[in-house]
């Protein structure tokens, strides 16, 4: 009996637990042993398919800045075009759907001279956005005045009368004040609530020499400077050379406006130095909180755990995903280059190999 026990427990005849001799199609890569065949795996990755964008579950998702402002671009809303005034809903996530915002349908704007195309995207990055109820400057009595506030048939208001952007006042000198003037400076106070950023829109108008003399009493190029939050910007107006142009069915115009904005932090005053043709700030944007921004097309359909720039709305069925790597927000799977698997079975070895290692008595015992 003693001899038999020694044979059964010898190295040549050991019984290996946790190893099966059944066929296995599963291979996993390990850190220490490389590729290993196992009897079972749990897939940890998925490869998404492209779908519509969706609202992010558990939070509000903002598509257009003003969903109820029909036939308006986001730039129309950001500048306060008369027929594009409305509430911008709060949102924790926003869709950048106008990669290069289109022209505002009002007075012709020289978009490429400033960063004004970025204004809708700047606003989109805030959770809460509202337009002030009061004007930040009294345009009629501003330095260099008295002024009348100009309007244009190219910018009709809700009653189809002449209008202009709500964020700016076109300061046209009164008849007895149409003369050239040296640069003057006006302070732009902070009128938003503490903790908000104030986005102040301003600009200037220029035209051909004849119109410049008629409107302002000076046909020379005019100088303009804005300064806020440590950022100073300089401009010189261009006189003439503009083909007549209409925006969104408006009246053809020989003049152009240049529009810019400045960001004023809580309690900080800004300044604008100007000559003739100034578009003085009026209503300002008050914004707070952060909204995560992702680039994609509209509309938003349904809800999803995750918003992905390439795949749209995703529901998280696995912790990881393969495919195209792009920006994503929400409860999203983690991108990996290759599929990941978690072994939930035992290590596989062919039956012939097990018989050789165990020997005759071990094979019977196994």
From Swiss-Prot:
InterPro entries: Capsid_hemagglutn, Hemagglutn_HA1_a/b_dom_sf, Hemagglutn_influenz_A/B. It is found in: Virion membrane; Host apical cell membrane. Glycans are attached at residues 37, 71, 157, 177, 315, 344. GO terms for cellular component: host cell plasma membrane; membrane; viral envelope; virion membrane. SUPFAM superfamilies: Viral protein domain. In natural infection, inactive HA is matured into HA1 and HA2 outside the cell by one or more trypsin-like, arginine-specific endoprotease secreted by the bronchial epithelial cells. One identified protease that may be involved in this process is secreted in lungs by club cells. One of its GO terms (molecular function) is host cell surface receptor binding. It is a single-pass type I membrane protein. Residues 1-12 form the signal peptide. GO terms for biological process: fusion of virus membrane with host endosome membrane; fusion of virus membrane with host plasma membrane; symbiont entry into host cell; virion attachment to host cell. Keywords: Disulfide bond, Fusion of virus membrane with host endosomal membrane, Fusion of virus membrane with host membrane, Glycoprotein, Hemagglutinin, Host cell membrane, Host membrane, Host-virus interaction, Lipoprotein, Membrane, Palmitate, Signal, Transmembrane, Viral attachment to host cell, Viral envelope protein, Viral penetration into host cytoplasm, Virion, Virus entry into host cell. Major glycoprotein, comprises over 80% of the envelope proteins present in virus particle. The extent of infection into host organism is determined by HA. Influenza viruses bud from the apical surface of polarized epithelial cells (e.g. bronchial epithelial cells) into lumen of lungs and are therefore usually pneumotropic. The reason is that HA is cleaved by tryptase clara which is restricted to lungs. However, HAs of H5 and H7 pantropic avian viruses subtypes can be cleaved by furin and subtilisin-type enzymes, allowing the virus to grow in other organs than lungs. Binds to sialic acid-containing receptors on the cell surface, bringing about the attachment of the virus particle to the cell. Plays a major role in the determination of host range restriction and virulence. Class I viral fusion protein. Responsible for penetration of the virus into the cell cytoplasm by mediating the fusion of the membrane of the endocytosed virus particle with the endosomal membrane. Low pH in endosomes induce an irreversible conformational change in HA2, releasing the fusion hydrophobic peptide. Several trimers are required to form a competent fusion pore. This is Hemagglutinin. It comes from Influenza B virus (strain B/ID/1986). The lineage of its organism: Viruses, Riboviria, Orthornavirae, Negarnaviricota, Polyploviricotina.
